[in-house]
Amino acid sequence: MLMRFYEENIPLEMKAKKQWVCYRKRLIDGKVKKVMINPCNMSFAKSNDPSSWSTFLTAMKVLRNPKYKMDGLAYVLANDYVFI
């Protein structure tokens, strides 16, 4: 089930960055984990590989499309992170 969040509360500075992924919750070793998915090609995303990240708009389109069965959206922190 998709958790409710308020898109308007996400800072524009974050929305402008191409650092977004979707995730699916999976039971791994008895614990629920968030598995990051590249919204552009549905492959696994990597926290250390910017080529596997996407724009906010692309990630939102995938999140809202029930055929992809995503559980949420995640912002990947990069070396240039300056938000407080």
Which residues fall in each region the model found?
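Conserved phosphate/metal-binding and DNA-contacting active-site motifs used
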Residues: 1-84
